[in-house]
Amino acid sequence: MRRYLGDTFYGGGEWVLLTAWLGTHMAAVGDLEGARQRLDWVESMFTADGDLPEQVTVHPQAPDMVAPWVMRWGPVARPLLWSHGMHLVLVRALRDASAVR
């Protein structure tokens, strides 16, 4: 999930924590399949070291803006504890929603 259309922060990539947040909402409203799909994507973003980044710049909205941000501020934040926390919130939301249904 992206922050907003036209985002250029590190190219406007997909945000791990926002995707997990959306999955948590989906679980809360009963869309368990959608929530599981978001969880699968989030978990596919773990590095070999077990880190989750702030965002993923594989398919940026503004590819020409990735390099300027990296040159100015360095690589995308990783690990980002907020992403890790939202992953756990989504896992819990899915577990709780599955137990109710």
Where do the PLM segments sit?
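Conserved small-residue packing positions in alpha-helical repeats and bundles
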Residues: 20-23, 88
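Phosphoinositide-binding peripheral membrane targeting modules
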Residues: 34
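Extended glycan-interaction surfaces of carbohydrate-active proteins
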Residues: 1-16, 37-101
